[in-house]
């Protein structure tokens, strides 16, 4: 099992301390163990507002709906319980890039995590499945369409999962800003796993969307946490268009090499804007759904590594982006709705340091 063993070599400490050593979990109550996991595995001294109550509620076996701003610490709300509970936590995620980022971060923190996706070889997928069966893997990231395959659900039933976390849960609702039909089938899981605690997480969901998530996922009397959407470290600004390209170039020049994202509403405008930035000597690249997968993956990887300063993108550059040091987000066009605007500007300043969101308007 070379593929899996390489991952687990990176992650021996927390896996042994919180996955196998059941005696320790019996000595410490779950709340104390959760705080220990937070500190020793993830390196935080204390929970952010709302996190501790959510985690305690999940550990009690109750369903939860978590609406927390981008960069607010949603992932820890299921990652900490996953290491306290004795079993497998399944995380539903819509994007391969998002799964990979999460798994890489967990492995770096010493947590035995893996994902199943279409980019893996059959052998790699079998090794991950074996790791779930033997209890080696604590968190499994998977796309909704793969999770809902009958043969996979049969396997999952034998693995005795302890928690199901549905990330980007607004995708299940037609009232949400990013409806995905494959999410709709997740409601069938409640009948299959009636006792399994469910956690739904999203950064943006109005009252109607929240009700839809609860109904469609079959959440039972869920604890609902809606956190403040204030991002005090982000400075929101408006700029009226006169000579928009010149204004944009001047603004980017003022950023002095800082990392940023520029959103445009069309692929043609993305390509044109990226080319003009490149011609002026900026480290910039285009990103949209019309590009081949390997090109998009290369752009994202370079951006994550700080080998690329600016990504000019359509909304396709979205949920999979988890880069802490984005210092500015520009909307060169008016975004399609306020939810999209909030989520996209929320990619700035995830490290808590000052950042800017600039909106150009006519």
Residue spans for each PLM region:
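Cationic, low-complexity basic patches in intrinsically disordered or flexible, solvent-exposed regions
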Residues: 3
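Helicase motor core with emphasis on the C-terminal RecA-like subdomain
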Residues: 28, 32, 36-41, 45, ...
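Conserved Rossmann-like nucleotide-cofactor binding loop
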Residues: 97
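Short, positively charged and aromatic/hydrophobic N-terminal segments
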Residues: 9, 14-24
């Amino acid at each position: 099992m070379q593929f899996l063993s390489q991952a687990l070599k990176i992650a021996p400490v927390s896996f042994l301390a919180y996955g196998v050593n059941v005696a320790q979990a019996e000595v410490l109550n779950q709340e104390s163990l959760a705080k220990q996991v937070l500190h020793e595995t993830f390196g935080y001294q204390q929970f952010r507002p709302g996190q501790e109550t959510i985690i305690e509620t999940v550990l009690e076996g109750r369903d939860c709906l978590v609406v927390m701003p981008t960069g607010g610490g949603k992932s820890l709300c299921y990652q900490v319980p996953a290491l306290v509970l004795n079993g497998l936590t399944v995380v539903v995620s819509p994007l391969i890039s998002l799964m990979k980022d999460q798994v890489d971060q967990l492995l770096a923190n010493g947590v035995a995590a893996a994902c199943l996706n279409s980019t893996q070889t059959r052998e790699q997928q079998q090794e991950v499945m074996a790791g779930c069966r033997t209890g080696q893997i604590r968190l499994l990231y998977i796309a909704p369409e793969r999770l809902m395959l009958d043969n996979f659900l049969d396997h999952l039933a034998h693995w005795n999962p302890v928690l199901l976390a549905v990330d980007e849960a607004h995708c299940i609702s037609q009232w949400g800003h990013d409806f995905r039909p494959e999410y709709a089938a997740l409601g069938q899981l409640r009948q299959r796993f009636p006792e399994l605690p469910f956690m739904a997480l999203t950064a943006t969901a109005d009252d109607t969307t929240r009700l839809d998530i609860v109904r469609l996922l079959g959440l039972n009397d869920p604890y609902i946490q809606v956190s403040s959407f204030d991002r005090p470290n982000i400075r929101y600004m408006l700029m009226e268009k006169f000579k928009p390209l010149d204004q944009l170039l001047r603004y980017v020049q003022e950023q002095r090499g800082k990392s940023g994202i520029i959103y445009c509403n069309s692929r043609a405008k993305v390509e044109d804007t990226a080319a003009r930035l490149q011609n002026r000597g900026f480290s910039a690249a285009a990103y949209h759904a019309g590009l081949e997968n390997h090109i998009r993956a290369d752009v994202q990887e370079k951006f994550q590594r700080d080998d690329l300063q600016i990504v000019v993108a359509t909304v396709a550059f979205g949920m999979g982006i988890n880069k802490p040091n984005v210092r500015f987000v520009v909307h060169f066009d008016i975004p399609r709705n306020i939810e999209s605007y909030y989520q996209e500007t929320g990619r700035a300043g995830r490290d808590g340091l000052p950042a800017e969101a600039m909106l150009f308007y006519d």
